[in-house]
């Protein structure tokens, strides 16, 4: 019991095995380790956390696969660079471990790799244990998870993590067992076993392939082999049939790339019984692929044909045509207007173009279906003619990337955000305003030998699934693609650059060379955007992005090129080379599917993406890439362009001018961002709808909306919103009625102080200075009359007769209450009005503590409010180890730090010693609250709950 961590370990054991309410340090607590992304839990995340902080590691697992290595490849590379040693022991048991994975592990200089050879004498080998040593402590994860992608991300797995000193009995037994297995004569080093094992593995794979082939040959006719719709396709078909029964004639299928839109349409056509079908595309290659898909669904029972530049099968029942060919007058007029019962428009975001409009205006089918993964692609919209409008705002089914991954419709991807060379930034990527000499210099940087070598090294380390690489590389411009292709070829890769100038035949030939293994093979095709959509190349197993992210939509389009499932393809690798780009913040937005543009959500996904992403996919950023994204988030100032994009998209989708609450309900941009930029939603509408008739509001009406948007819209508490809601319907309400309503709706009783504070706030008294006091003194909403009832003012009643003003008030109430119920209507922490780990501004703290006015301008590191004291901490700040220094970059140098997940060390302000009134305000407060923000650029603080003081002592810095 003399170990320095004994007490912490005992507390951890008590929490884990005796009383879960017992407080203990998470670092010393046993845990149940399992996979459930909805709970933010994955075995992979636990492994990465332990690998990141360990001094050495030992792993003994029965099975290691290539996908398992891929999931851990970035952290393993980092450990190699740090020189952290590791020993990994696997086995030939069941010949399951993949030689490719073992080869990749053996490349790492810090890892010793052995294989335990099984036989009838020693029996099987089925261990699954991960041992991590950090200084004198061991973190050990033992259970059911092998080092396979499924086991550490997706499968139902049960593992236990224990924490022990080296002297602990269980740790000793585990370490001894590992040592015995490692030193066993049956354990061979990589060089000793690999050739023999590869031969053994190959023979085993040949047998398995023969068994699969034999099983396939048992299928003798088309009916037996008939394709069946997946879960997404079934839901789409059911919705479509309901729509048709209601007489709906147009609809959209919005489905993420790779989820099977073409097959979905074929199944729907089969179910609805259409005999004459037009399938319209914008490229020959896509028409050919669509025809093949339909043939797999219908077999030989339907006559199908192409109408393209080279094919003219006008007599077919199902026609697959290119828009360029069919839009010609002489070709259209070959058909009666009602010839087709169903017209299907692939990549329907192009339907606003004149050529599509010509075809759509000509035909009068019973039903028109549009299909796209990118309905909001802004460059495809023409004023007054957007995709939603074209298809009458009917969405038959929508499935986004996250949902598609949950449903296992896509190939898992492993995304790696890798730091590009320091020289790669926005100046290089966007050189339109530069001189010829500057452009030439930028071109040299983008195509430098150093960059070529760096890209090749990363691509070869992170690898691909399958026998050989079949990759796409996206570049900023075609000149760059051509030069990079030339240099890659000089260094041994087989690549080809393609552009829009290349013919369909050249493109088709390039794709054939890329995917087929028995012709003049290509490793990579380089392009700018011709592969961003449409072309179906399921075999793609690596995508390299050598350009800045221009939008989440384009990012997902390019990522999506690798997401189609294919035989012998277990996963796709996405390598994103991240330069110093201002748009880097769009990367986590695209990956997460979170369109709120909430900065904290963006940061969270960069740090914790692996615990949140569905399925076996993984997300990794190296440390410099993380910082580049964080900097892009911090430097994101004006959001007006993003607001406009979100507004336009939502308006198009709804077919009307959206309300503020619509953004919230449709998961568009965070309405709080709109208010920060425009002060009121009405002001934003006026800015957006310059050609639309938005009713004017009086100055006093605008003032009320601005004040309410600033104070109560965020929904941190509901009573002001609820009282306002009551006063929209009733001329007056009693205090008892108001109390009862709040109690019934929100489950808590307002005391008289809270009621008085609510009334004062709605009277305009929550202000920060004399200027605001004078400004908001004009707020005329309510009064307390002689009967002690809360009554609307007559001037407010007159304002309510204005429909636009009433509409805006209803919107504030609706959104504010929605937000309260979703974020703040939880069990409050020990009777205080704060929710653990939610975010609050200094203004919110004043608001929730019933302050008579906004004190946020005088709330710095500490504020005492009656019996409560609040500590406000900025966690990431520049510091110096020089104890004689008081300031860093003009700011006080505080040493605020988490010593553990339970103990926080806080420095008072300079010159505020232990006996100062400042310090005594903290020490003597009955309730003490800790609020932390990560960076100065953030406005809000995370509420980390109440704390007790363990020790008060002079700080290292003078007078703290």
Where are these regions (language model features)?
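PLD/PLD-like phosphodiesterase catalytic module centered on the HKD motif
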Residues: 1-230, 234
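Conserved segment of the helicase C-terminal RecA-like domain
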Residues: 552-557, 561-591
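Post-DEXD/H (motif II) to motif III coupling segment of the RecA-like Helicase ATP-binding lobe
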Residues: 350-415
């Amino acid at each position: 019991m003399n170990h320095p961590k004994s007490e912490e370990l005992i507390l951890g054991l008590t929490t884990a095995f005796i009383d879960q309410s017992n407080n203990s340090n998470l670092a010393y607590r046993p845990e149940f380790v399992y996979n459930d992304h909805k709970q933010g839990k994955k075995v992979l995340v636990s492994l990465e956390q332990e690998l990141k902080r360990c001094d050495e590691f030992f792993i003994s697992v029965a099975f290691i696969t290539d996908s398992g290595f891929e999931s851990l490849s970035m952290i393993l590379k980092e450990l190699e660079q740090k020189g952290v040693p590791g020993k990994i022991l696997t086995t030939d048991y069941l010949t399951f471990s993949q030689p490719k994975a073992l080869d990749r592990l053996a490349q790492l200089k810090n890892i010793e790799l052995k294989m335990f050879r099984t036989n009838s004498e020693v029996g099987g080998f089925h261990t699954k244990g991960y041992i991590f040593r950090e200084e004198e402590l061991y973190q050990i994860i033992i259970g059911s998870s092998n080092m396979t992608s499924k086991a550490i991300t997706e499968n139902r797995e049960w593992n236990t993590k224990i924490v022990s000193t080296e002297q602990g009995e269980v740790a000793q037994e585990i370490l001894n067992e590992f040592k015995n297995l490692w030193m066993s004569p049956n354990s061979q080093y990589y060089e000793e076993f690999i050739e023999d094992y590869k031969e053994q593995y190959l023979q085993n794979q040949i047998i398995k392939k023969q068994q699969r082939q034999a099983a396939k040959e048992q299928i003798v006719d088309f009916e037996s082999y008939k394709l069946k719709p997946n879960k997404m396709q079934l839901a789409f078909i059911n919705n479509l049939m309901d729509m048709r029964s209601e007489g709906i004639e147009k609809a959209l299928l919005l489905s993420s790339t790779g989820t099977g839109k073409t097959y979905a349409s074929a199944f729907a056509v089969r179910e609805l019984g259409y005999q004459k079908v037009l399938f319209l595309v914008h490229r020959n290659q896509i028409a050919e692929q669509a025809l093949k898909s339909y043939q797999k669904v219908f077999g030989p029972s339907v006559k199908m044909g192409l109408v393209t530049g080279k094919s003219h099968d006008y007599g077919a029942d199902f026609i697959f045509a290119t828009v360029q060919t069919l839009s010609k007058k002489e070709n259209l007029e070959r058909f009666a207007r009602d010839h087709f019962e169903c017209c299907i428009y692939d990549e329907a975001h192009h339907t606003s173009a004149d050529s599509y409009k010509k075809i759509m205006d000509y035909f009068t089918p019973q039903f028109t279906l549009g299909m796209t993964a990118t309905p909001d692609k802004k460059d495809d919209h023409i004023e007054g003619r957007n995709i939603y409008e074209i298809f009458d705002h009917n969405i038959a089914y929508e499935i986004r990337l996250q949902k598609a991954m949950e449903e296992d419709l896509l190939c898992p991807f492993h995304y790696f955000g890798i730091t590009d060379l320091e020289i790669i930034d926005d100046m290089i990527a966007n050189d339109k305003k530069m001189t010829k000499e500057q452009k030439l210099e930028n071109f040299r940087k983008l195509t430098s030998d150093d960059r070529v070598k760096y890209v090749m090294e990363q691509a070869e380390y992170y690898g691909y699934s399958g026998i050989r690489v079949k990759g796409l590389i996206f570049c900023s411009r075609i000149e760059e693609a051509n030069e990079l292709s030339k240099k890659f070829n000089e260094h041994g890769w087989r690549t080809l650059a393609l552009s829009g100038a290349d013919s369909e035949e050249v493109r088709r030939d390039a794709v054939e060379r890329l995917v087929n293994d028995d012709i003049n093979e290509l490793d990579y095709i380089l392009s700018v955007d011709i592969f961003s959509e449409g072309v179906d190349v399921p075999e793609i197993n690596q995508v390299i992005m050598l350009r800045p992210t221009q939008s989440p939509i384009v990012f997902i389009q390019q990522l999506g090129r690798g997401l189609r499932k294919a035989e012998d393809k277990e996963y796709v690798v996405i390598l994103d080379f991240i330069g110093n780009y201002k748009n880097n913040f769009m990367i986590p937005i695209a990956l997460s599917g979170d369109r709120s543009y909430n900065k904290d959500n963006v940061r969270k996904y960069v740090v914790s993406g692996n615990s949140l992403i569905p399925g076996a996919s993984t997300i990794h950023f190296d440390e410099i890439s993380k910082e580049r994204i964080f900097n892009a988030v911090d430097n994101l100032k004006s959001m007006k362009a993003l607001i406009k994009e979100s507004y336009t998209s939502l308006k198009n989708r709804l077919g009307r001018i959206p309300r503020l609450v619509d953004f919230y309900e449709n998961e568009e941009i965070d309405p709080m961002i709109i208010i920060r930029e425009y002060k009121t939603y009405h002001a934003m509408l006026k800015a957006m709808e310059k050609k639309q008739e938005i009713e004017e509001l009086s100055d006093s009406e605008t003032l009320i909306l601005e004040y309410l948007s600033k104070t109560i819209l965020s929904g941190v508490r509901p009573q002001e919103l609820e009282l306002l809601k009551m006063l929209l319907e009733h001329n007056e309400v009693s205090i008892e009625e108001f109390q009862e309503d709040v109690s019934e709706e929100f489950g808590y009783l307002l005391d008289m102080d809270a009621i008085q504070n609510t009334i004062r706030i709605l009277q305009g008294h929550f202000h920060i200075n004399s200027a605001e006091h004078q400004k908001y003194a004009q707020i005329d909403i309510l009064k307390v009359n002689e009967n002690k009832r809360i009554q609307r003012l007559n001037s407010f009643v007159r304002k309510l007769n204005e429909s636009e003003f009433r509409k805006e008030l209803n919107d504030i109430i609706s959104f504010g209450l929605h937000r309260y119920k979703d974020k703040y209507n939880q069990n409050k922490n020990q009777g205080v009005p704060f929710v653990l780990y939610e975010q609050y501004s200094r203004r919110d703290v004043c608001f929730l503590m019933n302050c008579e006015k906004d004190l946020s301008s005088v709330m710095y590191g500490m504020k005492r409010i009656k019996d409560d004291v609040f500590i406000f901490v900025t966690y990431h700040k520049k510091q110096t180890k020089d104890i004689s220094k008081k300031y860093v970059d003009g700011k006080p140098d505080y040493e605020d730090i988490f010593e553990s997940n339970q103990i926080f060390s806080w420095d008072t302000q300079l010159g505020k010693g232990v006996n100062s009134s400042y310090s005594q305000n903290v020490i003597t407060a009955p309730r003490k609250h800790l609020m932390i923000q990560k960076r100065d650029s953030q406005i809000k603080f995370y509420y980390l709950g109440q704390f007790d003081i363990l020790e008060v002592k002079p700080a290292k810095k003078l007078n703290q």
